[in-house]
Design a protein with these regions (language model features):
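An acidic-aromatic substrate-binding cleft motif
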Residues: 239-308
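Generic detector of bulky aromatic hydrophobic side chains
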Residues: 10, 20, 106-108, 287-293, ...
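N-terminal accessory beta-strand-rich subdomains and adjacent acidic, glycine-rich linkers
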Residues: 4-268
């Protein structure tokens, strides 16, 4: 039988509606109108699909209102205020949804004794209209996604509708969708560790984006610019080999009513794992002007500068 769960933002403007039937889907609702929806699942090597024919064991809701110290950021502290819903499923996995006043995030979790191999993660972000976007393609026009995975992530943003985007080229995050009336939703990710970064590609003829992940490297060789890069020559048939008990990357959606809210949003900072650097007394924040690029050199110092050791 279908089951429905929901969690709202602290100010009640944004809501996530989760539907559990033969698969798991969720919708983001703002001001009683659906912004987007998606099916979510994670396929393990061997064929097990986390999210297929799911059986809910427990749903836990919590409210958090705390501050995160941010000594090297544009703010001294970051306010972390959200409502969270954790759904635990039979099979030792779960989904976590967080709803902030300025957006939504979700992630998979697993609790297994042995390491697991992830074949793929499903995410298909469907929009109700063919909205305009601000999209950065990979800076490669090569014909296959395999060839496009190797890129510098340096590309201007194109302002095109979802269906007007080139579906033969991968898109990089963050990607911004213009919902009209000044509202926008920014798709990005956070707390990405031991997992490939997410690309997006538009579904042909549909106002939707599908997640694409680079498979894990099997064979690498040194090459590229000045022989400074490791080039992938062959890939495995999975995207990650990782700990069986872990939280996976957050898939985040920043929702703004005007553009200045985007500039002031701290969502990626909030979603990051706590710093593992215990002693930060030696870190002195300041400005740097590409010291690693401009001749790799320093001047006026009492030692021989440069790449010489």
């Amino acid at each position: 039988a279908q089951k429905n769960y929901q969690v709202q933002s602290p100010n009640r403007d944004i809501k996530v509606e989760v539907t559990v039937a033969d698969k798991v889907t969720f919708a983001i609702v703002q001001d009683h109108s659906e912004v987007m929806n998606s099916a979510v699942s994670m396929t393990l090597q061997g064929g097990e699909v986390l999210g297929a024919n799911p059986k809910v064991l427990k749903v836990t809701k919590t409210s958090v209102d705390k501050e995160i110290p941010s000594p090297f950021y544009k703010k001294d502290v970051v306010k972390d205020i959200y409502n969270e819903m954790q759904i635990s499923f039979r099979g030792n996995y779960g989904l976590v949804f967080r709803v902030y006043n300025d957006g939504v995030a979700y992630r998979f979790t697993t609790k297994r004794k042995e390491p697991i191999v992830i074949a793929d993660e499903e995410a298909v972000y469907n929009f109700p209209s063919d909205y305009k976007t601000f999209t950065a393609y990979v800076n490669s026009t090569k014909p296959t996604f395999e060839e496009q995975f190797f890129n510098s992530f340096e590309q201007p943003y194109a302002n095109e509708t979802i269906t007007g985007l080139n579906d033969k080229r991968l898109k990089i995050l963050p990607l911004l969708v213009d919902l009209g009336d000044g509202r926008k939703i920014c798709i990005t990710e956070a707390d990405l560790e031991d997992f490939p970064g997410m690309f997006l590609n538009n579904e042909t003829g549909k106002p939707s984006f599908k997640a694409v992940h680079a498979p894990y490297p099997k064979v690498k060789e040194q090459g590229g610019h000045n022989q400074l890069q490791m080039l992938v020559k062959e890939r495995e048939n999975y995207i990650a080999k990782t700990s069986g008990t872990r939280s996976f990357p957050w898939r985040a959606f920043i929702i703004s009513r005007n553009d200045k809210e985007l500039a002031d949003c701290d969502m990626v900072y909030r979603l990051a794992s706590p710093s593992r650097v215990n002693d930060i007394s030696w870190i002195k924040p300041g400005k740097v002007a590409w010291d690693w690029w401009n001749d790799w050199n320093l001047y006026g110092v009492d030692f021989r500068a440069g790449i010489n050791n």
